[in-house]
Amino acid sequence: MARPLPILGGILLSFSPPAEATAQYSIIPEPSRTELRQETAKTLQLLSDQEVPTLETDAYRLTVTPQGAHLASGGREGRIYGLATLRQLRDQLAGQPEGIPCGVITDKPRYPWRGLMVDPARHFIPAADLKKFVDMMAYYKFNRLHLHLTDNQGWRLPVPGYPKLKSVASRREESFGDGIPHEGMYTKQELKELVAYCAARGIDVIPEIDMPGHNQALHAAYPEFFCFPKPDMNVRTTAGNSKELVCPQKPEVWKFYASVFNELKDIFPSGIVHLGGDEAPTELWEKCPLCREARTRAAMKDEQEQMKAFFAKTAALLAKNGQTPQFWYEGNAGIYHPGETVYAWRQGQALQSIEKTKKAGLNLIMASSEYCYLDFPQIQGQRNWGWMKTTTLQKCYDLDPAFGKPEKEAGHIRGVHAPVWAERLPDLNHLLYRAYPRACAIAEAGWSPMGVRSWENFRRKLADHRQFILKRFNYDMERTQGNEPAFRWENNK
């Protein structure tokens, strides 16, 4: 029977699964290797669960027999992924009382990094809501949750000794002229509980403290940290960036960031701190007397050399805590240091980023906006900014993080990452609507070798997964022109 799947361009897609569809597994992401057998399994009781040293730590082997399932894994990660696959097979079996085929699944991820980013800086997401998002991530074997905690529109991390982060930086008067105040800040305990919740599901949490730009909320709270303090600065109420950068010549700035990094160390055991580093116009550094004097003293030729010095000092602060930095890649490899990790995000620059980061000795995570930015509309006509192109499910699925390059040219690529920016996504419902089902495609891009991936097979599986997610998480992944959650802002700026 044909199964409807409304996913592209607002058009209801219908297709007929192949005749042997009942003799296939519906696993997303597609396993590395699947060997099906003639027998049928009507129970998936876990009969054995063993660690096998011959398997890699993130690999597993799941054997389905008529009597039940046997799991072998190389370590904790592999066991988590094997149990995730077993969970999906049980969901499939629940809808197929005639049974599913027996077989052997031998599996491991193509890339070690498979992440999603949420943006509570723009719209605060309560920690309790994030747990549902995390559960769905784990179902699809994602292993990194990136929290964009600070930006022009809000600051969400508490830092001892800096009370105005909560009283000023975490609040704004409205969003896009809607007249509705918005605020929110996590407690330290909430963040620790979220980290533990994620860890139990094989997910590390990566905090981001954006710098030296994207800091209008910080400027509103502590204007003395900036080159030209503006005591009347407000937390930004619209999208976009400001030209205000923290002043690297002020000791109080480094005292503040040392406190921030100490707090992150106590909360996030991953040891990774994303520092942003993107969209940082240096015109005020050029004009700042303190910065000009520092450049002259150090014989710096321009503000980009000052930017390099800024991040060298920041990296040194992190190193004292055993932490390492990550950045949004801006193409100027000179401000990064060999061995550091950057995210390729700028539209149309993926191939260039792969080549330049390889030459510079950097690790790369593929987050190319035309494939990976899940806040972009997924159906033509959905509301967002006018400049955003529609990124369909198939466009996301077409992503090869290596862009066809061989291992010797792309071996520094660590994985794939999909941000869900939230300037116009006010709550979990909007966040999930934009993230799924495209996150399923990103999951397969990060996990599955190109040789086992198939768009047609993915569409077949996704029809089943709509039912799996509906029953397990009470969430419908159907996407049509008319079922987008109500959109508060009518302007398109």
Swiss-Prot record:
Optimum pH is 5.0. The activity drops sharply below pH 4.5 and above pH 5.5. The active site is at 151 (charge relay system), 214 (charge relay system), 279 (charge relay system). It catalyses: Hydrolysis of terminal non-reducing N-acetyl-D-hexosamine residues in N-acetyl-beta-D-hexosaminides. Substrate binds at residues 122, 278, 345, 373-375, 421-423. Significantly inhibited by the addition of sodium dodecyl sulfate (SDS), but not by EDTA, urea, 2-mercaptoethanol or Triton X-100. Strongly inhibited by Cu2(+) ions, in case of which the activity is decreased by 70%. No significant inhibition with Al(3+), Fe(3+), Ca(2+), Cd(2+), Mg(2+), Mn(2+), Ni(2+) and Zn(2+) ions. Strongly inhibited by PugNAc (O-(2-acetamido-2-deoxy-D-glucopyranosylideneamino) N-phenylcarbamate) in the sub-micromolar concentration range. PugNAc at a concentration of 0.5 mM decreases the activity by 50% and the addition of 1 mM PugNAc fully inhibits the enzyme. GO terms for cellular component: membrane. One of its GO terms (biological process) is glycosaminoglycan metabolic process. Residues 1-21 form the signal peptide. InterPro entries: Beta_hexosaminidase_sua/sub, Glyco_hydro_20_cat, Glycoside_hydrolase_SF, Hex-like_dom2, HEX_bac_N. Optimum temperature is 37 degrees Celsius. Retains more than 90% of activity after 96 hours of incubation at 37 degrees Celsius and after 12 hours of incubation at 42 degrees Celsius. Keywords: Carbohydrate metabolism, Glycosidase, Hydrolase, Metal-binding, Polysaccharide degradation, Signal, Zinc. SUPFAM superfamilies: (Trans)glycosidases (SSF51445), beta-N-acetylhexosaminidase-like domain (SSF55545). One of its GO terms (molecular function) is beta-N-acetylgalactosaminidase activity. It is an enzyme of class 3 (hydrolase). The keyword Signal applies. Its EC number is 3.2.1.52. Zn(2+) binds at residues 227, 247, 288, 291. Hydrolyzes terminal GlcNAc residues from terminally unbranched N-glycans and from chitobiose. Hydrolyzes beta-1,6-linked N-acetylglucosamine and beta-1,4-linked N-acetylgalactosamine from pNP-alpha-GalNAc[beta1,3Gal]beta1,6GlcNAc and pNP-beta-GlcNAc-beta1,4-GalNAc substrates, respectively, as well as beta-1,2-linked N-acetylglucosamine units from the non-reducing end of N-glycans. Hydrolyzes GlcNAc residues linked to alpha1,3- or alpha1,6-mannose branch, but has low activity on substrates with more than one GlcNAc residue on one of the mannose branches. PANTHER family: BETA-HEXOSAMINIDASE, BETA-N-ACETYLHEXOSAMINIDASE. Belongs to the glycosyl hydrolase 20 family. This is Beta-hexosaminidase Amuc_2018. It comes from Akkermansia muciniphila (strain ATCC BAA-835 / DSM 22959 / JCM 33894 / BCRC 81048 / CCUG 64013 / CIP 107961 / Muc). The lineage of its organism: Bacteria, Pseudomonadati, Verrucomicrobiota, Verrucomicrobiia, Verrucomicrobiales.
